[in-house]
Curated annotation (Swiss-Prot):
Transmembrane segments: none
Bias (Low complexity): 31-42, 234-247
Gene source species: Escherichia coli O78:H11 (strain H10407 / ETEC)
Protein name: Putative lipoprotein YghJ
Knocked-out gene: effects: No effect on assembly or function of T2SS-beta.
Topology in membrane: Lipid-anchor
Lipid-modified sites (N-palmitoyl cysteine): 24
Function: May be a substrate of the type II secretion system beta (T2SS-beta).
A GO CC term assigned to this protein in UniProt: plasma membrane
Gene: yghJ
Amino acid sequence: MNKKFKYKKSLLAAILSATLLAGCDGGGSGSSSDTPPVDSGTGSLPEVKPDPTPNPEPTPEPTPDPEPTPEPIPDPEPTPEPEPEPVPTKTGYLTLGGSQRVTGATCNGESSDGFTFKPGEDVTCVAGNTTIATFNTQSEAARSLRAVEKVSFSLEDAQELAGSDDKKSNAVSLVTSSNSCPANTEQVCLTFSSVIESKRFDSLYKQIDLAPEEFKKLVNEEVENNAATDKAPSTHTSPVVPVTTPGTKPDLNASFVSANAEQFYQYQPTEIILSEGRLVDSQGYGVAGVNYYTNSGRGVTGENGEFSFSWGEAISFGIDTFELGSVRGNKSTIALTELGDEVRGANIDQLIHRYSTTGQNNTRVVPDDVRKVFAEYPNVINEIINLSLSNGATLGEGEQVVNLPNEFIEQFNTGQAKEIDTAICAKTDGCNEARWFSLTTRNVNDGQIQGVINKLWGVDTNYKSVSKFHVFHDSTNFYGSTGNARGQAVVNISNAAFPILMARNDKNYWLAFGEKRAWDKNELAYITEAPSIVRPENVTRETASFNLPFISLGQVGDGKLMVIGNPHYNSILRCPNGYSWNGGVNKDGQCTLNSDPDDMKNFMENVLRYLSNDRWLPDAKSSMTVGTNLETVYFKKHGQVLGNSAPFAFHKDFTGITVKPMTSYGNLNPDEVPLLILNGFEYVTQWGSDPYSIPLRADTSKPKLTQQDVTDLIAYMNKGGSVLIMENVMSNLKEESASGFVRLLDAAGLSMALNKSVVNNDPQGYPDRVRQRRSTPIWVYERYPAVDGKPPYTIDDTTKEVIWKYQQENKPDDKPKLEVASWQEEVEGKQVTQFAFIDEADHKTPESLAAAKQRILDAFPGLEVCKDSDYHYEVNCLEYRPGTDVPVTGGMYVPQYTQLDLSADTAKAMLQAADLGTNIQRLYQHELYFRTNGRQGERLNSVDLERLYQNMSVWLWNETKYRYEEGKEDELGFKTFTEFLNCYTNNAYVGTQCSAELKKSLIDNKMIYGEESSKAGMMNPSYPLNYMEKPLTRLMLGRSWWDLNIKVDVEKYPGVVNTNGETVTQNINLYSAPTKWFAGNMQSTGLWAPAQQEVSIESKSTVPVTVTVALADDLTGREKHEVSLNRPPRVTKTYDLKANDKVTFKVPYGGLIYIKGDSKEVQSADFTFTGVVKAPFYKDGKWQHDLNSPAPLGELESASFVYTTPKKNLNASNYTGGLEQFANDLDTFASSMNDFYGRDSEDGKHRMFTYKNLPGHKHRFANDVQISIGDAHSGYPVMNSSFSPNSTTLPTTPLNDWLIWHEVGHNAAETPLTVPGATEVANNVLALYMQDRYLGKMNRVADDITVAPEYLEESNGQAWARGGAGDRLLMYAQLKEWAEKNFDIKKWYPDGTPLPEFYSEREGMKGWNLFQLMHRKARGDEVSNDKFGGKNYCAESNGNAADTLMLCASWVAQTDLSEFFKKWNPGANAYQLPGASEMSFEGGVSQSAYNTLASLDLPKPEQGPETINQVTEHKMSAE
């Protein structure tokens, strides 16, 4: 019972991360297995601080003359004392499964979705008034985890749940069922809208030690049926929790990063920012009439598609209980196509197009008739209309073109989808035809992202060429050396954004494509000396890997936001050929240096051209105004200094650009100012004595953009404006002052919260660093140290191949490390280590250089100068290595700047979305990463993962026979693609074979079974399966439904059959005349089609039939299931069997066989099944097939129900009367349902759903391991997620089971009870009837009804709208209890008129007579109409269901119940605009209905139903 009516909005704590600063890396260990100092987001960033040794004097750099704003010459650098590092504070997140965040609870007094803790202290999490989880965090104090700032705590790992799988299962079940934001797939909200909800949660959490099935029933009745209404299209919540590999961290700095870590960097609002949005179709027209739901409000999209929301929250869209999809509210225009992945999004757009009418200005309007039809199929509508089916994509490039079927459109030609489609089209004057035949003409290599990169890099010849990209270094000063390369990470966290530039981080990262590698694939040097035949391979894009981006681009509406992670790039605009080192401008504004190449000028010209949408063109007579909030640019120079400064301006080479200083951005017109160059923060210009402080980084305590500025900038970009930000944000961005900046980036799908540089220096360093380069050429002798007096390798005399000892002995820990050779030499009486290293810069004459070389040769007798002049990384000889021409600085030999090679190949390699072969390989490497706990493979950014996974699903989820043809262009990478397919299909595809190397890897990593297994050649489905961790397995599992060459291990689901098939003939009823769709005539055969075995069915019927194998929901694309699949997502197969014909088929996984005819005449026919095995089948009171029949599932068929369940359940050990009693109870329930709805005839208006003389028409109830929506859902069959193959008990008790009453009640619910908002209520009235009839009282409402009158008084005439489903149920309960003493059914049946038997005079049941007569009257019953005015107010409708309910109840009761209905106002809807403190209301009973009721002049009750505060209790005797 809700005593508080305002929805609470929990403020979410910011979740953006902090990481340690990168230090300097002057030297190196000389290890060949050293990774570059910057990682790709999959490993921790080491913190390297200089040794506290005496600080040599810096080498002063020449100062240009004149210098207009000279910086003071820095003092000699301080020698920092080593300090004990404090244990860093970290940010924790309470999660389910490590990835689904829990909000609304508190941990250590802060929000559970981002709380601070210190490693070593306990974390205690509370929901309601209950401690639900305690965690020990001592392990987080490990030094190896210092760089990891974000930590997820899984509820399942709580100390309270340790050692009990039942407790874990029950705790998760309760939390997911209590979710108050079911539309948000990333979070679970434990925000209770009333004290009662909170107490209910507390009470249930204390009972988590119950058996799971018992607890599930308790939760289903107590929680799910009190669901907060109007929070999502469907309030059915799924108990599925993401499955994640133990040890993953949601921090991109971790060594083992979780698959969805990027979500933890999204903007989380700390304040309510009221926003207006628009829902549009793919043509940009507004979509009106769609329900939307957020945590802060709800409503229906307006005439132009407008809706209100609070920035950053999840927004869900739907029509009645039909779920269209949900998005984060971080933009103001949301397209239907964005509500799902590419395929689903196109289907949503097509569905709305089909069922909408055209409004003003070409808007799409969803009429109320669509909602009404959908309402007849509550929840199951999501299963009937499948939005994830393929939609006729055309795939390919050049000659390689594949056309896929349009399953989405085809589904409306058969079954219940056809019935719904026909009904809607009849009510809306015909539906719209498909807008185009192929909804998505898509090409995996469509190149949109690649095209943008090619433009900006100048690969596109219409743009300026950029071959070397300049990366500035930090302005720190250790030992006279400048800081490390600084490209601050700008991560794309949604598919609205993509990277523009990522630096390489593979082992040969500093070598350009086409150069010879320094390291081989095992990170060993190439042994090229005689007699070895080993030759170094070239660096190629196939072996390249990349760090996270430091330049990224995001789309916001029609505009763009580009972010570059360093402020020095602004100086290139001022002096495009004088920026790299010690640049500046003189007093006349002229650049003091002009020696830098054109590459970066060209890059900036490309950026300005692209961001302005070609409004500005270089070298052309074009002009553009650029707005900015920058006043000054600073040039990079030596020392810990800001650098030379100059006013922000454009060099004259950027012709035609005018700068407009700006401080506000409201109503800015992109036509007038197409581009803004902004900073989010002031610069850090003071740093005291901190030698690690980096000048010019963003001072996040001093924002330059307010939240209003950000709102205005987003509006500006939506209209087509572009924003360029060049800034070094070294912060985890948790500060309140940074929230506007974070929101701005988030709107474009970007985040800078990673707080790390992602560019490696060139490998310069101390002389002992292997593989290094200097500005000038060097000479170096690199070698592997001897082991036991011998090299760590041998060269085979015969094959000339190099054999490494550690590999031969399988001792990976003994892998040798390359070193720069050294020797000891006495200097002034001391032994000093001398390295075999020469920098030519130290030798001014040829004679000096020759002497230095000879000194090394003399130190190592037999050493020679290397002979291969084309390869500069030879070992075991004195090697010449050319210089880079980039000056190095100071005693740590750090280059002044770093250069990245750009080329067409680099562009393709960076994006790595070029072809199918690359894509499938990348997904495989991503899966290896998780299967090996990060030791192998490479993790994909979650945005890239989604993009590649969706692309590949389009290619793989069909039955196309792909092939590779030698000698033809292979633009799409079919060679690699088909090789992978062949590994899963035992070489069924033409042109390639599964290579031994790939096959071994797949077997070793448990993706397919090897020859030693009894399942050799099968794929391992790896349940529970999370596509974000194992995308290749998920893709192949999806394909296995079409491609029977992929054989899936079915041991876990549905179960293995080890019996040979047999031939069986059965006579099957084909008559079809259902009263309602949910009691249909699909016939069970009790036969099983084994997986991958040929089955044939021969028909002697004179009518065609449909054959169905397996009854299971399609889980494809259902986000909550895709992260924890326990079975193949698609299982059901259907086949058409013509009259007197035969059909032969194989099914992928096995399943029970069903036959459905459509004969309008009573008839049956023989069918002969070949290759089938028997399943346990109890029918007509006996076993037709024994319980020990081979199939894993069995069925019970009673007179009214067919019940499907794992066969052991059919032992029915929980039923004293066994299956006979269970069957009788099912039939009793079916008969009682007929009674409740007043159905007692075999034809006409009051025809029963099921009855003896309607053979073959029955309700269906099936148990499955995973279902599409909720714990259970309505439909034909009703689906239930209770699936316990090892249990001997039946999970259902038909005469005491809220779940079956609730779901079957959904199917049967009908007018006049089905008012708006009653979807999860009207069905439960049947359940109350069952409780009264078989348990003696309405237990479900017995407690809540005691305070119902007070609740009505406090609700101010809006009790319905303010309440949840449980509260609304009280309205019907009060009406029934009032009728118990105030309604006499006999008044309606005068003497001589027989009283139908379903009416009852029993105490506690008499009140139901009112409902039964209301149902009959709504169907047009005529008894005594003439006696009571002649007009049937239950059968007539003005279109308002709430009016009908009030008039019907009052007329049948012959009592004016207006006061009761005024207090409840059923059918009303509450909505709350973001920021509003009070709810608003709409709908409900109309004034005209009250006027009509008043005109009937019915007596008012002495005590109306609104006064009822208790239920009638009847002491039960056997009925």
